[in-house]
Amino acid sequence: MKKMGRFMAVVIAGLLPSLAAAQDIKSYLPVTDERLLHPEPENWLMYRRTYDSWGYSPLARITTKNVKKLAPVWTFSTGVDEGHQSPPIVNNGVMFITTPKNQVLALDAKRGDLLWRYRRDLPEDLFQLHPTNRGVALYGDKVFLATVDAHLLALDARSGEVVWDQVVGDYLSGYYMTLAPLVVRGKVMVGVSGGELGVRGFVQAFEAETGKPVWKTYTVPGPGEAGHDTWPGDTWKTGGVPVWITGSYDPQLNLTYWGTGNPGPFVSEGRRGDNLYANSVIALDADTGALKAYHQYHWNDAWDWDEVSAPLLIDVRRNGRSIKALVHAARDGYLWLLERGADKISYVHAEPFVHQNVFTKLDLETGRPTYDPQRIFGVGRRAEFCPSVWGGKDWPPTAYSPQTGYLYVPANENLCSALTGKQEEYRPGQLYLGVDFSAIELLPSADAKDHIGELQAWDMSTGKKAWVAKFKSHNWGPVLTTGGGLVFLGGTNDRYFRAFDAKTGALLWQQRTNSGVTGVPTSYEIDGVQYIAVQSGWGVDAQRKQELLDKAFGTHTFVPQGGVLWVFALAK
């Protein structure tokens, strides 16, 4: 009875959000399927701007020649601490950003004036590991938000008022959401977080107009479903495999591509088997949610190597052959090149982009790795492995430039980890790791004193690394590429936001901000002026990782918190 009372209080609180409207937006351009398929160069309408997840803006007024004149033109303090990771989404001069704790801000993208603000009242008994949010989706005259208490909201784009509110999961069972929704053909798609809390992951689609559920596809197959036999006993019920980063979409195949997270608990000996569809890319029919194809990057994961970053859809010409590719820089430290088809995902090539000592070889036909058993920890058995639990690259997205043909990877080198397993009993809504969370070890190599963070450029036509920029700090920075031949990146603990020459890797410009820049940068144009926008606000795993590095090095690194949106343009 007590539990029901808490639940009713949460429902009531969810119906009473905090909304501050400075002014309604009188002129708002509705977002259509056509505009999402072919966005205007001056706008940034979705998480990575285009369905192929390139993170590329064709705008070219800011170039390698004049970027040194880039300067702040306005800033906006969000009033919130913790990790700010969402991209500034821009539609016809109106900007939408989100912050931790599910605040949505609508701003005049030219002047920085507040148009409206939405704050969600979150339940007091909510438990999650990541209060962050990675942005909104747009469709019609609505703004869609996936919340940390596992609701999907449709807000009126002009006023911020709630149009509909749909429950996606039970937060008391460990479900929460941090991703930006994906809108395809009138459907809003989301995945869930909670892989460390014993959830059963899924992707679900809803009608954009009404919020009515359309389909739901579990990432851990149940009885009678293909792949169920890769989970012993009842382990599938608490198998994890969350989906917490926005997917990609191929309109020709009508398939959405999603990266999936780790199985649970971390210690793998109690769930022996491949544990499908963990640590994979899955292809789902956009209309029905039917699983059409998958590729598992690594099986029976024991290193917390989520592979949730959606692959980039790139046409690659390699060894005289044209490939409709899926490209993924993985947390497991390998750069994967796959080929996508209507009902198949085929392995083409993979190689490590950071030091990796777990895989001893890959099958030449399938890409399936063979493991060094000494790198697999167990109950009461410690094992060291490289890269670390945060991987060669965590969630911060890569970007691609069609000008250079390069993929740009925000990597972390010279870091390993150690884990020791323990027996763990599943309790709904609580940590289900099989390890002591406070005893996770981060082990810098000798070369870490030289550098940890990297920005790598990989030539997709040759499969070779073209250049690398190195940083003493670890790197938690999403990447933006532009038509001006530039690559933008933050992510370091020195609080700088930087611009590099996309072809050579030369550092051309940098600006120190209030905090660490962990937000996804975007670019847009108004009245002939190109802008670069990014949120600065350190926290969540960037800070957790920094604390472990300080412990390993015997240092103390202070990175101020507090979210600020920075908007830059060329000085006149």
Q: Positions of the model-derived regions?
A:
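Blade/loop signatures of beta-propeller domains
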Residues: 23-72, 219-226, 369-375, 444-445, ...
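Repeat-blade elements of multi-bladed beta-propeller folds
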Residues: 44-48, 83-103, 127-152, 176-197, ...
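N-terminal cofactor/phosphate-binding cores enriched in small/glycine residues
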Residues: 53-169, 481-482
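Extracytoplasmic beta-rich repeat domains
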Residues: 76-89, 117-137, 165-180, 197, ...
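Short loop/turn segments that connect beta-strands within beta-propeller blades
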Residues: 108-111, 156-159, 208-210, 286-288, ...
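Repeat-solenoid scaffold signature
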Residues: 176-210, 300-360, 375-395, 399, ...
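Short, conserved, GDST-rich strand-edge loop motifs in beta-rich repeat architectures
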Residues: 190-201, 258-275, 413-448, 537-557
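Blade-level signature of beta-propeller repeat domains, shared across WD40, Kelch, NHL, RCC1
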Residues: 522-572
